[in-house]
Design a protein with these regions (language model features):
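Small-residue-enriched segments and motifs
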Residues: 16, 70, 84, 137-140
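Non-catalytic connector elements of ABC transporters
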Residues: 79, 89-191
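Glycine-centered loop/turn positions within well-structured domains
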Residues: 37, 61, 70, 82, ...
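ABC ATPase nucleotide-binding domains
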Residues: 1-71
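ABC transporter nucleotide-binding domain
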Residues: 59-94, 115
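Generic alpha-helical hydrophobic packing signal
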Residues: 19-22, 45, 54, 60, ...
Length: 191
């Protein structure tokens, strides 16, 4: 991990320079790292390993948006895991899932079995808070981070983390407030 001892800004700068040189020269490089951001920024393809066994191979986008397991989803970035059971299909090809007593639509990546419980992967940046739609939730953390607002909410007994970008023009929810966790059905990956 050649960049591990550098400060954060220099690490990002050097990572960018390595990628630029790699693309300019057209070389193949193997880069071993535990920093997921380095893997995403420097790779055309990523190999995720778990206990010495290959867990998934793919492009950064494939692995991030379509992980094949909870391990891969959690390893490659922040991920929320919601348990939901399949209720029915809709006319537009979506799946209605029951999560903590609420029903939501998701875009499944394959056939789902009625009544079967699935794990839904939701990335923090793919969710927002609002007054309507989605799932009922309660805010347990609200933290301004500059370019985004960091929230932790409880959906029933499940903690969900989300990051809303550009909070300047959005309503900021306070700890204890009840609201709705909303997301695009295409943003949810069903395992």
């Amino acid at each position: 991990e050649p960049l591990s001892n550098l400060d954060a800004k220099l690490r990002v700068s050097m990572r960018t320079e390595i990628r630029r040189i790699q693309q300019e020269v057209g070389i193949t490089a193997i880069y071993v790292t535990h920093y997921q951001s380095h893997a995403m920024a420097l790779s055309d393809n990523i190999i995720i390993m778990n206990k010495g066994v290959v867990a998934q191979v793919g492009t950064p986008q494939e692995i991030y948006y379509h992980p094949n397991s909870e391990f891969v989803a959690d390893f490659i970035g922040e991920a929320n895991f919601l348990k939901g059971s399949f209720v029915r299909s809709t006319d537009n090809g979506r799946a209605v899932m029951n999560i903590e007593g609420g029903e939501i639509e998701v875009a499944p990546q394959g056939e789902l079995e009625a009544g079967h419980e699935y794990t839904l992967v939701l990335r923090p940046e793919a969710a927002t808070l609002g007054e309507e739609g989605g799932l009922p939730c309660r805010v347990v953390l609200s933290c301004f981070m500059g370019s985004y607002q960091n929230y932790h909410v409880m959906v029933g007994d499940t903690l969900v983390k989300l990051s809303e970008n550009n909070p300047k023009n959005k309503r900021i929810y306070a700890v204890g407030e009840e609201c709705r966790l909303r997301f695009d059905p295409d943003a949810v990956h069903v395992l």
